[in-house]
Amino acid sequence: MEDSQMDTSSPTESSSEVNFTAEEDKSQETRSAAGVCYCGKERNLNIVELLCATCSRWVHETCVSYQLGKGKLLPFITNYVFVCKNCSASGLESFRKSQATISQMCHCAIANMQQAASRDGRRQIQFSKDKEIIPYIEQYWEAMTTMPRRLTQSWYSTVQRSLVKDVQTLFTYEEHAEHGAMYGLFHQDLRIIKPNYESMSKSGALRLTDDGYTQASLSKNNRQKRKFPGTDSGPTGKKGRPSSDITANVKLPPHGYPLEHPFNKDGYRYILAEPDPHAPFRQEFDESSDWAGKPIPGWLYRILVPHSVLLALHDRAPQLKISEDRLAVTGERGYCMVRATHSVNRGCWYFEVTIEEMPDGAATRLGWGREYGNLQAPLGYDKFGYSWRSRKGTKFTESHGKHYSDAYVEGDTLGFLIELPEEASLDYLPNTFKDRPLVKFKSHLYYEDKDKITETLKNLHILQGSRIEFFKNGQSQGVAFEDIYAGSYFPAISIHKSATVSVNFGPAFKYPEVLVEHKAKGMHDRVEELITEQCLADTLYLTEHDGRLRLDNMGL
């Protein structure tokens, strides 16, 4: 019974699993020139590479932020759908491996053995079914397919049928006097092995939408109710088990941050990381199998800098509800806080907040806060924040409230301006965190950084000439705070009970005249600045530690 379920495709279907045509050969060189990895380096057949279903870019596995797991994939597999971060509206990759046919597994096994021989300086293009192909599939079964490993050997006969059936389309055959039946690849160029997305698309098994999602079209008898993002645990098969079909929906994270992620709490902060293509010994690490199950050196990665200013998903109290576009937040019960993704440490900056809903008993404290501000308290509770309260217009810092303005209410649009004079003696480059440990959470890597609250409090100093000013519906309410502590400040929102506010980080402000009058920048301008600063900081770290960043220093 097992045997009959494993490979029932026709010769035509099998040969289309990997797209080999005359047109493919002619156009391969053109496409490969345009389809290099994020890192800019050429293809490397010794490691896993994934083909984007949208742009046909080949991406090295170790340049993918999504942690696929060392040893859990093989080069030359074709049973997957991958969307690169450049084609995804979320800014993060999506990947789904499907169940492979025995024909695909044979093809993958032969290709890997051929490449291994070439890497060792040998030329071997044909392999024994019994002595090499079947043992290879048995060894790497889980890396090739999502299909459960077979408990009997009945699938051996399926291998034989698949190889014979696809001779002259996928495989070559030769009878050897000593070794018996020998099989090789009909197309010797391993660079053209890839998923046949075109065939999947034509058959309805794959559909690419504008925002990079990949999903199947459902038949009339198999339509599902629409589900909202984050409410679906994935498609299921018989008996409610997760489906591994290529037609399954691929769930993408919203706006460049994983749906499931660690929160900053209990004295630790977590910073999303991505592979650093400029790190030394990157290729040696990529091709090494010795790192399976071992800690990855932090300097091989870098901080993933957000490409837009939004409310942070990880840097918030978990009970706060963030909208899908990450530009609105709703509170629940007592005061708690969320910070934005970007901070500022010098210059004059501005953002706006609109009070969307303010039920009876609800309140907000809005303003600017630093990274160590308590997320389970109102902004202005400690020395790390400066806030403006909706009730009575009170201003707060260090839990001391002073009258500042009239109250603000539902429908008001508030402006928040901060001015931080530059200090010549300070280094404003951001931390690289490359010396911090990397922790894995739900297939993504994060730098883990311990809070240094005591040390930070000890080193607080006043920044002369600094100020914070608040605006209501375009009108200044006066300077709220002067000579505040120096440091990096985030737009911060704290909410009591079920109030809802929306944020506007620019460029289309409701009251743009505030920027002109005060020569301020909108928070949206901070994006390119931070990308440049982070790149420079990473480069300086690698330069300063040149010669000391070695894989053999890590115990290999």
Swiss-Prot record:
Zn(2+) 1 binds at C37, C39, H60, C63. It comes from the Eukaryota. It is found in: Nucleus; Chromosome. Residues 288-510 form the B30.2/SPRY domain. SUPFAM superfamilies: Concanavalin A-like lectins/glucanases, FYVE/PHD zinc finger. Disruption phenotype: Generally pupal-lethal with mutants showing a wide array of homeotic transformations. Adult escapers are sterile and show pattern formation abnormalities in legs, including tissue overgrowth and small supernumerary legs. In wings, the pattern formation defects observed include duplicated bristles and sockets, transformation of campaniform sensilla (a class of sensory organ) to bristles, ectopic campaniform sensilla and reduction of intervein tissue with increase of longitudinal veins and cross-vein tissue. Gene3D superfamilies: 2.60.120.920, 3.90.980.20. GO terms for molecular function: DNA binding; enzyme binding; transcription cis-regulatory region binding; transcription coactivator activity; zinc ion binding. GO terms for cellular component: MLL1/2 complex; MLL3/4 complex; nucleus; polytene chromosome; polytene chromosome puff; Set1C/COMPASS complex. One of its GO terms (biological process) is dendrite morphogenesis. CDD domains: PHD_ash2p_like (cd15583), SPRY_Ash2 (cd12872). A zinc finger (PHD-type) spans 34-90. Keywords: Chromosome, Developmental protein, DNA-binding, Metal-binding, Nucleus, Transcription, Transcription regulation, Zinc, Zinc-finger. Residues 1-27, 216-251 are annotated as: Disordered. InterPro entries: ASH2 (IPR037353), ASH2-like_PHD (IPR049455), ASH2L-like_WH (IPR053835), B30.2/SPRY (IPR001870), B30.2/SPRY_sf (IPR043136), ConA-like_dom_sf (IPR013320), SPRY_dom (IPR003877), Zinc_finger_PHD-type_CS (IPR019786). Pfam families: ASH2L-like_WH, PHD_ash2p_like, SPRY. In larvae and pupae, expressed in imaginal disks, salivary gland and fat body cells. No expression detected in central nervous system (at protein level). Residues 1-19 have a biased composition (Polar residues). Zn(2+) 2 binds at C52, C55, C84, C87. Core component of several methyltransferase-containing complexes. Component of the SET1C/COMPASS complex, composed at least of the catalytic subunit Set1, wds/WDR5, Wdr82, Rbbp5, ash2, Cfp1/CXXC1, hcf and Dpy-30L1. Component of the MLL3/4 (Histone-lysine N-methyltransferase/demethylase TRR) complex composed at least of the catalytic subunit trr, ash2, Rbbp5, Dpy-30L1, wds, hcf, ptip, Pa1, Utx, Lpt and Ncoa6. Interacts with hcf. Interacts with trr. Transcriptional regulator. Regulates a number of genes involved in wing development including activation of net and bs and repression of rho and kni and controls vein-intervein patterning during wing development. Required for correct expression of a number of homeotic genes including Scr in the first leg imaginal disk and Ubx in the third leg imaginal disk and haltere disks. Required for stabilization of the histone-lysine N-methyltransferase trr and for trimethylation of 'Lys-4' of histone H3. PANTHER family: SET1/ASH2 HISTONE METHYLTRANSFERASE COMPLEX SUBUNIT ASH2, SET1_ASH2 HISTONE METHYLTRANSFERASE COMPLEX SUBUNIT ASH2. This is Set1/Ash2 histone methyltransferase complex subunit ASH2.
